[in-house]
Amino acid sequence: MTNIRKTHPLTKIINNSFIDLPAPSNISAWWNFGSLLGICLIIQILTGLFLAMHYTSDTATAFSSVTHICRDVNYGWIIRYMHANGASMFFICLFLHVGRGLYYGSYMFTETWNIGITLLFAVMATAFMGYVLPWGQMSFWGATVITNLLSAIPYIGTNLVEWIWGGFSVDKATLTRFFAFHFILPFIISALAAVHLLFLHETGSNNPSGIPSDSDKIPFHPYYTIKDILGALLLILMLTLLVLFSPDLLGDPDNYIPANPLNTPPHIKPEWYFLFAYAILRSIPNKLGGVLALIFSILILAIIPLLHTSKQRSMMFRPLSQCLFWLLVADLLTLTWIGGQPVEHPFIIIGQLASILYFMILLVLMPIISIIENNMLKW
């Protein structure tokens, strides 16, 4: 009798994706982040669902409803902080996942890579709108500043901003629609993640060497299921430690002050995971130029496959490219630091230099160094 796992239409999909899937024998812990992102998404959807049961998307009661969740709802505080810090864990995993893709040349699977970029944009949009919902000072002013950037679009900009706001400022209509979008987007992300996996399974996974591994595959279960469970346990441990010991470590104290349109906070800044893009935005004195640089700082990932000039796929055997990659990581950390600093000397010039370096590495230095490495190897 044939195993039902391999014949039933539903279990067959699960079997071919998570059990009998042929996987490279040498993929390292850097390949764990896909499953960790799936776990993060599930945590966010579940905690978000329970928060939505008690939250009210009205300017008069939004802040109070969040306070009510933390004070009066059974274990409401843990649900709220799991959700807030879960977003941080989500972005840590995202950045490491994208970094792995850049380092090992996984971007050569262009369909998978492009859906990944779409997912990144969707998660960033979701996180931004979620940050607005508690209706604290940073929620209100963050929403005002970021949505206002659209007014830089020639001709239609002002109308577009007022259309998104649902009025002439960030108000009740804005909060209500942001809540609606924040609720629906994770389900769209889930569907996109399924398509991401679909395209990945068309080609099979890449591996650290960047060499095709068709001749040496092992079943996903039990080898990588065990490995993923270990990663999941470490992720949950880190999240639990963060939630129980320092839940406000990554948040902004200003968000404990109810939103007040008449009082601007001294330093308006987004959550830590947007600071690198915010620094790039601020480093350009022109509004439209800043917005374009902001968008392109993420969209640049889409042209990475076109800029791949190396004869090797992975950076595993390319020390010069490795040096450039880690310079890029250091540059992004510098941008993250600058994004959280006030707009004054010397932070302005450091931010501008770091922004130039970011685009220089990806657009100019990486392709040139790859060609030099090809010549050094006489390829």
UniProtKB/Swiss-Prot annotation:
Cofactor: heme b
GO molecular function: metal ion binding; ubiquinol-cytochrome-c reductase activity
GO biological processes: mitochondrial electron transport, ubiquinol to cytochrome c
One Pfam match: Cytochrome_B
Keyword Transmembrane helix belongs to the record: yes
Domain of life: Eukaryota
Keyword Transmembrane found: yes
Bilayer topology annotation: Multi-pass membrane protein
CC cofactor note: Binds 2 heme b groups non-covalently.
CDD domains documented for this protein: cytochrome_b_C, Cytochrome_b_N
Keywords: Electron transport, Heme, Iron, Membrane, Metal-binding, Mitochondrion, Mitochondrion inner membrane, Respiratory chain, Transmembrane, Transmembrane helix, Transport, Ubiquinone
Positions annotated to bind heme b b566: 97, 196
Note: Heme 1 (or BL or b562) is low-potential and absorbs at about 562 nm, and heme 2 (or BH or b566) is high-potential and absorbs at about 566 nm.
Role description: Component of the ubiquinol-cytochrome c reductase complex (complex III or cytochrome b-c1 complex) that is part of the mitochondrial respiratory chain. The b-c1 complex mediates electron transfer from ubiquinol to cytochrome c. Contributes to the generation of a proton gradient across the mitochondrial membrane that is then used for ATP synthesis.
Quaternary structure annotation from Swiss-Prot or TrEMBL: The cytochrome bc1 complex contains 11 subunits: 3 respiratory subunits (MT-CYB, CYC1 and UQCRFS1), 2 core proteins (UQCRC1 and UQCRC2) and 6 low-molecular weight proteins (UQCRH/QCR6, UQCRB/QCR7, UQCRQ/QCR8, UQCR10/QCR9, UQCR11/QCR10 and a cleavage product of UQCRFS1). This cytochrome bc1 complex then forms a dimer.
Record-stated family: Belongs to the cytochrome b family.
Designated name of the protein: Cytochrome b
Organism expressing this protein natively: Mustela putorius furo (European domestic ferret)
The gene coding this protein: MT-CYB
